[in-house]
Amino acid sequence: MHYEVDVTIPRPLDEQTTRFLESVCRSANRVSRFHGDDAGIRLTVEVSGMCREDAIRSAVREIAGIFPGRTDGRYGEPKEI
């Protein structure tokens, strides 16, 4: 099954981070979109998994590769796609 998981990173979305995330979305990465403000960044990650827990674990691994040390974010409920 394929899921979308929303991940919130407690980091402001500045110009440099916006440019970085735009290039991440264009790469072979699983981040499909993002938005944010001064309070945090919300990324939508497309992942595969057999269940909700697998989807969240996959999202954690994906975000850890993009923002090392930032896996303390909040993860939304996976949605089947």
Pin down the residues of each PLM region:
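Long, contiguous binding/interaction regions
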Residues: 1-81
